[in-house]
Regions:
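Bacterial N-terminal signal peptides
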Residues: 6-13
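N-terminal periplasmic/intermembrane-space "pro-region" immediately following the signal or transit peptide
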Residues: 14-86, 125, 302, 307, ...
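Residues on the lipid-exposed face of transmembrane beta-strands in outer-membrane beta-barrel proteins
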Residues: 64, 93-99, 135-140, 182-186, ...
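Surface-exposed loop and membrane-interface regions of Gram-negative outer-membrane beta-barrel proteins
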Residues: 72-91, 99-147, 160, 164-169, ...
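Predominantly the C-terminal beta-signal and adjacent terminal strand-loop region
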Residues: 417-449, 453
Length: 454
């Protein structure tokens, strides 16, 4: 495998100043510039725009991704659960085709194959999923009274912002998250509107092409954006989350949440920010749901051309259940959150939490980015547990004090060329004295990732 990566580096090396970069959401890419052979810097660039007619609106774009990720975690759940230390590696291969049949019709299909190797614990649905339909949707573009409207039908991903706090594609694990349903995107009077109604896709991994929609986990909503994602914007949204047979506090029942949120992000001079607040109401069985969360990242980029240092402050909080056994559930559900929001380790989830972190990133050279920082985590209320991903109560954590622990994190990313990126993360997490008294261990997590995009 190392020889394959090395060969790819040589084959795909070369300047590509005029070619568009690859995106986390591959269906957002626009490679029409590569219709000109003069802009094709690598052998695979010719696949990005295959003309299907005499005009530029009819073409096929082919692409894919190969990702290798090795990781080691020595104390899952701080050593308080049944699982022990483990180290293993992921292999993910995705291939897609993007057919544009004129200005009004587009079809995007992606096949994904995800494997896990060397894991001692049983593989989960986010670890492995043999060849299956990752994405398959059709876009229909029309204009109504001069305003553009896009209708998207089929299997698709949802992500509305860069941080992806509560709705994310789940890039960190091996199997990305998808939904089956319908989405409408329109613009009118300087506002962008998005409406959707979806069933989550159930990843099965029993055999190839066995994934199905899961009507027991439904997600719908409406978002309204004022401004541009490239500068400053303000979003208001409503989500409806409905899950049959959801687990909470040792019980299982129907869970329905209506989430109302505001999010603002942008840049002003050397300052940047991303701030979000969400309030949830609903029912879990016979209990009423009242929960909340806030997430904030504030950054400052220092002047000067050398190393491009950026200092960021992260302030987050999410409610926990203050009175177990009553008729109200106050534990915040982070819905379809980005698992790597705090770190890639999955040690903590965005529930019953107060997090404060400070991080510094630098770029010693143009392709190399380094980041280092740390923070402190505590439970928002002592009556509720600390939670690991995905919304798993950490055993015996309700016995300890509010303080969960202190962590230090180091990240490195090296962009070899337009196609290949190497990255790593190291985490050192020291549990609080209260958690250590009930048996918690210090946690060390490490990962290395090679990602090849074309």
């Amino acid at each position: 495998m190392a020889r394959l990566i090395a060969a790819a580096v040589l084959a795909l090396s070369g300047a590509a100043a005029q070619a568009a970069d690859f995106a986390l959401l591959r269906w957002t890419e626009d490679h029409r510039d590569l219709a000109d052979p003069a802009h094709q810097a690598t052998p695979l660039d010719g696949l990005k725009h295959i003309a299907l007619g005499d005009d530029s609106a009819h073409y096929l774009s082919l692409g894919g991704q190969l990702r290798l990720k090795g990781l080691s975690l020595d104390a899952p759940l701080f050593g308080l659960g049944a699982a022990g230390a483990d180290g293993y590696w992921f292999q993910r291969l995705n291939l897609h085709g993007d057919w544009h049949a004129g200005p009004h019709l587009r079809v995007f299909v992606e096949i994904g194959d995800a494997r896990v190797h060397g894991k001692d614990a049983p593989a989960t649905i986010v670890d492995a999923n043999r060849a299956d339909l990752q994405l398959a949707f059709a876009d229909f573009n029309v204009e109504i009274a001069g305003n553009p409207l896009l209708l998207r039908l089929g299997r698709q991903e949802l992500a509305f912002d860069n941080w992806q706090r509560f709705v994310a594609v789940r890039e960190g694990p091996n199997v990305r998250r998808a939904f089956d349903g319908v989405r409408l995107i329109g613009s009118v009077g300087g506002y962008e509107l998005t409406a959707f109604a979806m069933d989550a896709v159930a990843n099965r991994n029993d055999e190839a092409f066995d994934d199905r929609d899961n009507p027991g986990l439904q997600f719908s909503g409406l978002r309204i954006r004022s401004g541009s994602a490239g500068t400053k914007y303000l979003d208001g949204y409503w989500y409806r989350y409905s899950r049959a047979d959801a687990p909470f506090g040792g019980m299982r029942a129907q869970e329905r949440r209506d989430a109302f949120g505001l999010q603002s992000a942008g840049r002003l001079g050397r300052f940047d920010w991303d701030a979000e607040a969400q309030y949830q109401v609903g029912e879990f069985g016979d209990s009423d749901i009242r929960a909340w969360a806030i997430g904030n990242v504030f950054g400052y980029s220092f002047p000067g051309p050398a190393w491009k240092p950026r200092l960021s402050l992260q302030l987050d909080a999410a409610s926990g259940d203050r009175h177990a056994g009553d008729d109200r559930l106050e534990t915040f559900n982070p819905l379809f959150s980005r698992g790597s929001y705090f770190s890639q380790s999955g040690l903590t989830d965005f529930s019953n939490l107060v997090n404060t972190g400070l991080f510094l990133s630098v770029r010693p050279t143009s392709p190399l980015t380094l980041g280092f920082g740390g923070g402190r985590m505590a439970r928002q209320t002592r009556a509720d547990a600390a939670y690991a991903q995905p919304l798993l109560p950490i055993p015996r954590s309700t016995i300890a004090d509010k303080h969960i622990g202190d962590y230090w994190r180091f990240n490195a990313s090296y962009r070899c060329n337009r196609h290949l990126t190497l990255s790593s993360e190291l985490l050192h997490y020291v549990p609080s004295a209260g958690l250590r008294e009930v048996g918690a261990d210090t946690v060390h997590y490490a990962e290395v990732v090679a990602k090849l995009l074309f």
